[in-house]
A protein has these predicted regions:
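Class I S-adenosyl-L-methionine-dependent methyltransferase catalytic core
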Residues: 1-158
Length: 158
């Protein structure tokens, strides 16, 4: 992945980063804090990673026992990096978790709804100034993406 750097998972594993201006990776401090808060919910969870960038949050979830990660981003470089990172982490798990990446325009994709098993945790880290929070949260709520006990975590500018 030209132009990309490397990230590290909390366990030390190195991951690829898309680099450039296509993604803003979640800092290791924020990742650790979020994962510590979500720890009781991660084992066997279904994780939806919206605006996934490098896929590092999905990788953290996999490393902590998620059984399924779906990473969604509209940038092709981010999807390539995310797919590579998720595959590397999933390969170390047995039984192998389900991983999937989707290159999609987020709002229209979410508005189509979801016909499969809902997600337990949604992690949403959009570009801060693109007005995605409200329409995406509404689409998540209306589109069978969530169940009664689902958690939605939104990263935003401090």
């Amino acid at each position: 992945m030209s132009g990309g750097g490397q990230l590290r998972l909390s366990g030390g594993r190195r991951l690829l980063s898309p680099g450039g201006r296509t993604a803003r990776p979640t800092t290791s401090r924020v990742r650790e804090a979020v994962m510590n808060i979500l720890a009781p919910h991660l084992q066997d969870c279904r994780w939806l990673d919206l605006c996934s960038g490098s896929g590092v949050m999905g990788c953290e979830a996999l490393q902590r026992g998620a059984r399924c990660v779906l990473a969604v981003d509209q940038d092709p470089q981010c999807i390539r990096v995310s797919r590579s990172n998720l595959s590397a982490v999933a390969a170390s798990r047995s039984p192998a978790p389900e991983i999937r990446t989707e290159r999609r325009e987020l709002i229209s994709w979410l508005r189509k709804g979801w016909s499969q098993e809902p997600f337990d945790i949604v992690y949403f880290d959009p570009p801060y100034d693109q007005g995605l929070y409200e329409p995406c949260l509404i689409a998540l709520a209306k589109g069978n993406w969530l169940h009664q006990d689902s958690l939605v975590v939104c990263e935003h500018r401090s």
